[in-house]
Structures are given as C-alpha cells and as structure tokens.
C-alpha cells in the first residue's frame, strides 16, 4: 500500500507526547484519519467545518500546553485553518497541521481539490516539510516518517512555540490497509527524547558508563573549544574534530584529526564502534564519518543544539538537547576513569598521522603537501583561513593536523556551494587580520567579480589557488570512468589565471615548487593588496598520491 509508511508517523507522534487529533472529513485525508483512529490511544475529534476545527484544536493545545494534531483534506480546506493558525503563531500555541495533498503528477493539471500547498501558511508556522512517500525498497522507509514527526514536534515546542505544517501528498488507493504491526516498524531500540538546559545533568551516568564519542563540527559559540576539551577530559572521550570546529588548534590527546582516512578500514570501524555519540555544531564534512555513524545505529545519538535544529542526515538521533555547549559540558560533573576506548582511537590516530606525514617527502605538486606547507607558514600568525567547498575543504580535512595555533579556519558549509568564495573572503578580511583564501579553479571562476570590492576598499587577501583544470572532486566519486566523463563532469577549461589576474588587478605568481611557495607566501601575507598564488596540479596524479598517502595498513 502506498500509505503504510504513515503508521510509524502516527506512532512516533504519540511516543513524543501528542495525545489529541482533530479531523475534518475529506477523501484525500482518509489514510490519516483512519490511522489515527485505529491507533486507539489518541483522543480524536471530528468537526465538519475546518475553520471551527482549527480553533477547537487551538483550545485543546492552549489548555494542555502540548501540541495537538490538526488534519484536513486537500484544496481549499487548509485555507479555512488560516485564522486559527495566525492566532497560534502570535500566541505561541503548538499545533501540528497535517495537510493532505494531491501527488506531484496531479499538480497544475486541473485536478479537482488541488492547489499549491507548499508553505501554505507562510511565516505563520515555525516549520514546513513535505512528507513524501519513501521508495518501498529504501533503507529508511520506516524510520524517515519518524524523523519527520520528531522535527515537527520539536519545532512546535521551540523557544517560541507555534504551529507547524506537514504537507502529505497521497496517491490512490486512499483507504489504508490497517495492519497493527506497521505502527511499530522503524522504532528505535532507544526511544527518541528531548531535554532542555539543565536537564542534561541526567546524562552523567549514561555517558560515563559507555564508550562515548564526541563529534565537533563548525560552531560559533563562545568558549566552544574549551568546553568540549573539558567535556572530553571528564568522559575520556575522543573528539573527532572537523577542521571548521577549530579544535585542531589544540594539540590535545583527546583531539582526532585523521579519522577520515583510518575509518576506511573495516576492521577498525568495528573495533571503534561507540555506545554513545555526542554531536555539537554542524555535522563534520567527512563522508566516511557519516558512514561510520550509520553503522552505529544501536548507539545513543545525542545532539546538543541551542535551537533544537536537526543536523544528523544519518537519521540516527535518539536524543536532542536544547542547550549551549558550555551549559551541557558544565552539567557533566563526574569523571570517567576508563581510558580504554579513548586509547583505541589514539592508537589509530597516531598510526594514521605517521602515514600522512610521509607526504612531506613528495616532490610532485600535490595538494596534500601544499596544505601541510600552508599550515607551517600560518602557524605563527593570528590569521584567518577561508576554505572553499568541493575538494579544498576535504584536502584540509585530510592534511591539516592538530597543533597549538591561533589560525581560525572558516567555510561556507551551510549549503556547501562553490560560489561567493572571493566575496566571503574579502568580507572576512575587513577585520584587518592576515587573511588567506584556499580555493579551487572552478570555485574562483564562480566569483571573479567579487574581487572588485577588494580593490575598491583596498583590502588585503592572499589567495592560494589549486588549479587542476576542472572538477577534480569527480575523480574521487562514482562518476569517475562513466561515458563522457571529461565533458560532463571533469570539465577542463584551459583558462589562463595570469590573464585573469591582470584583468582584475591582482598581484600574480605561478608557484614552481614547494620552496617557491613558502617564499612567495611569506612575502604576500605581509604585503598590502590582493595576491594570487597559483599552484597547478594534475587530477589523476593527485588521486594516485591521495590513495598512496592515506592508506591505513593493519
């Protein structure tokens, strides 16, 4: 049946604390009404008028101070909810509005009771999401609806409580096959929970008695590094430090910097499995780390975020804590005395780091060694380094090691695009601190006009450009070797960056070797103006050298 995935959605909302559901009769919403009613645990109410139904649900939520489900069919039905939704938003009353909808193939073709219900209530809801039917063979067929329910519930109870819209396109047959066992499918072994602020103190015993792993992503919170280092020391937990977390500025025994390389080893992945995982900030860039997290599907996954934002694409989060990092870290008072799990990570880290350091002997032009050279020349400076997306942030993830330093690494990892890098770097440069942009050729071409403002306002920036003549990242991905690979993905352009530098008024230098890079970098970082240091590399050679230096041997 096309709508059986909704049974876990109904079950999850009840597990989270929803107890009431209000319906208005309709055909497209048949499955929702029947599944809520058949569940037998909800107090359900039917109101023939959608406007009245919405205010009725508002009254229940207002009295009980908890979210109430409000269901309507497709078409104009949702429009009748609007007055109550505006009241709920301004009064901060939590409602979860489920708008049944026609599927995509019936949109914009004159189908009856059909209009565009995307973000139908505009700014009057805290959150909007489409709950599409997952592919039947998808691994997350039963878990995905539960995660949508969790996001809806948390958004309704955010710091400013309010209504949430979940739009649900439904296909025929509309009458569901009612199987009681479907309600239980996709349930986590560890039921989803959420906590606020000081409630996190209840984690003391659970975290101290388990193999705990800390994931540190990009985060702008004050005292972020200090708080996580303190927490790691209490828990004896390794910190997998994304370069944008800036925890690699601390040569701490708790900080791991080479995990993306050694997590390619299957034996290690099994041996390093965690029982509790703590996520702070954005999910780290490492794809292998995300694959490792998915393997730990029986671990307690605790996400700590002041806004209750959902930042785990592996869909394994079991606990969300609404707290800043410092408050959570300070709530863990006891000290773990067991170093065994930490020592396993330290052993793998040390072995992998020794292998990665061998790149210092490489004489061919290779991004890995140039990153290490860049770190060496930046170490003594109170500098800022913006890293572009695609391969450059991954090069930093692999090759930037932990050491005591003041270099602040930044990146646009919100939506991970390759545009706007020069403009962002020049905005960062307005602080007056030494500023460096590490970018690739395609990223730089996307924002050449951004250099104009740097000339206009006489800003200082050193650009380190890895030019491999096209999309080098695709040589590391599944597209490598497909028909028309160069034309469709690698996209060699053959452009002359010296000419582009002359056009935009940059001070230009083509780097000839590693020693030349060091000399030119030391000069440019101390001189005013915008400087471009171009490093030409070969995509195929870089791929071969990457495999050579990142291989973890048992």
Curated annotation (Swiss-Prot):
Reaction catalysed by this enzyme: isochorismate + 2-oxoglutarate + H(+) = 5-enolpyruvoyl-6-hydroxy-2-succinyl-cyclohex-3-ene-1-carboxylate + CO2
CC cofactor note: Binds 1 thiamine pyrophosphate per subunit.
E.C. number(s) listed in UniProt: 2.2.1.9
EC class: transferase
Pathway named in the protein's UniProt entry: Quinol/quinone metabolism; 1,4-dihydroxy-2-naphthoate biosynthesis; 1,4-dihydroxy-2-naphthoate from chorismate: step 2/7; Quinol/quinone metabolism; menaquinone biosynthesis
Gene Ontology MF terms in the entry: 2-succinyl-5-enolpyruvyl-6-hydroxy-3-cyclohexene-1-carboxylic-acid synthase activity; magnesium ion binding; manganese ion binding; thiamine pyrophosphate binding
Cofactor(s) it depends on: Mg(2+); Mn(2+); thiamine diphosphate
BP term (GO), one: menaquinone biosynthetic process
UniProt keyword annotations, A-Z: Magnesium, Manganese, Menaquinone biosynthesis, Metal-binding, Thiamine pyrophosphate, Transferase
Annotated InterPro entries: DHS-like_NAD/FAD-binding_dom, MenaQ_synth_MenD, MenD_middle, THDP-binding, Thiamin_PyroP_enz_TPP-bd_dom, TPP_enzyme_TPP-bd
Assembly, per entry: Homodimer.
Family named by the database record: Belongs to the TPP enzyme family. MenD subfamily.
Protein purpose: Catalyzes the thiamine diphosphate-dependent decarboxylation of 2-oxoglutarate and the subsequent addition of the resulting succinic semialdehyde-thiamine pyrophosphate anion to isochorismate to yield 2-succinyl-5-enolpyruvyl-6-hydroxy-3-cyclohexene-1-carboxylate (SEPHCHC).
Protein name: 2-succinyl-5-enolpyruvyl-6-hydroxy-3-cyclohexene-1-carboxylate synthase
Organism expressing this protein natively: Lactococcus lactis subsp. cremoris (strain MG1363)
